[in-house]
């Protein structure tokens, strides 16, 4: 064991915390702990580049969300005496229960009488705690049914695709990030499920129609993919759209007004909508 390690600390607004965690995971950082209203990142390697990258990422988010204040504060980088911080990191990750779905890490015990979803957080791309993912998990328990042809559009960690597979759907996944596909396939293996098809890219590469599509991606991308999404919906198919900031909700509803809005949910500023393809008008 090396004698010293580097510790990067910062405080981030709760609503944006998961964006920063996913950003760090995407850069290959595995030892992250949430504690004392802040985030600790530890490594034997220098974290100076990561510190700089987090500041740039925060600036971009501030611009994207039109904020007039800083998202992160108290950013500090120190060198410390070593200890088993991997075990400390594991203690800081909490499982999440969404109705009957229990999402937990590979080292946490399963919960009886629940649908257990096992995730390796070191694989990045989300662990189910974000408001948008939470909403999708609730909706999928209602609309996932055996033998449905389903698509997880922008699969990330594969949590949503795994849930649909657990309910008996024939699931396909896609993401524009090859690492997300790898992460999803590995998490599927951990959960004993298979995806019917997986590809790096978007819905334009999909073949045929789907009975269920879930897209937990940002509003701008949903708006860009609107026509492709609709063109791949079977009659009476269910479409779940999530990852939408409330300031974009009106635009989303306008674009999808030809479908029947059958359910919606908002947690903090994050909105999710469920549509049925009844071919209105």
UniProtKB/Swiss-Prot annotation:
Its EC number is 2.1.1.-. It catalyses: L-lysyl-[protein] + 3 S-adenosyl-L-methionine = N(6),N(6),N(6)-trimethyl-L-lysyl-[protein] + 3 S-adenosyl-L-homocysteine + 3 H(+). One of its GO terms (molecular function) is protein-lysine N-methyltransferase activity. SUPFAM superfamilies: S-adenosyl-L-methionine-dependent methyltransferases. Its main location: cytoplasm. S-adenosyl-L-methionine binds at residues 133, 154, 175, 216. Belongs to the methyltransferase superfamily. PrmA family. Methylates ribosomal protein L11. This is Ribosomal protein L11 methyltransferase. The gene is prmA.
């Amino acid at each position: 064991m090396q004698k010293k390690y580097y510790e990067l600390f910062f405080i981030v607004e709760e609503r944006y915390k998961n964006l920063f965690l996913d950003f760090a995971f995407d850069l290959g950082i595995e030892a992250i702990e949430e504690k004392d209203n802040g985030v600790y990142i530890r490594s034997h390697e220098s974290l100076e580049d990561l510190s700089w990258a987090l500041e740039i990422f925060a600036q971009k988010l501030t611009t994207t969300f039109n904020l007039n204040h800083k998202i992160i504060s108290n950013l500090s980088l120190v060198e410390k005496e070593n200890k088993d911080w991997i075990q400390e990191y594991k203690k800081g990750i909490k499982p999440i229960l969404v109705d009957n779905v229990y999402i937990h890490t590979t080292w946490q015990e399963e919960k009886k009488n629940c649908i257990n979803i096992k995730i390796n957080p070191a694989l990045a791309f989300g662990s189910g705690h974000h408001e948008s993912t939470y909403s999708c998990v609730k909706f999928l328990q209602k609309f996932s049914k055996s033998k449905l042809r389903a698509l997880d559009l922008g699969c990330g960690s594969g949590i949503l695709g795994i849930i649909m597979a657990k309910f008996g759907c024939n699931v396909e996944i896609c993401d524009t990030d090859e690492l997300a596909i790898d992460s999803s396939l590995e998490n599927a293996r951990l959960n004993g499920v298979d995806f019917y098809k997986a590809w790096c890219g978007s819905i334009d590469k999909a073949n045929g129609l789907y009975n269920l599509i879930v897209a937990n991606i940002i509003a701008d991308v949903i708006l860009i993919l609107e026509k492709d999404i609709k063109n791949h919906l079977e009659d009476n198919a269910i479409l779940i759209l999530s990852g939408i900031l409330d300031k974009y909700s009106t635009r989303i509803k306008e674009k999808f007004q030809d479908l029947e809005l059958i359910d919606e949910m908002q947690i903090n500023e994050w909105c999710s909508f469920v549509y049925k393809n009844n071919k209105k008008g």
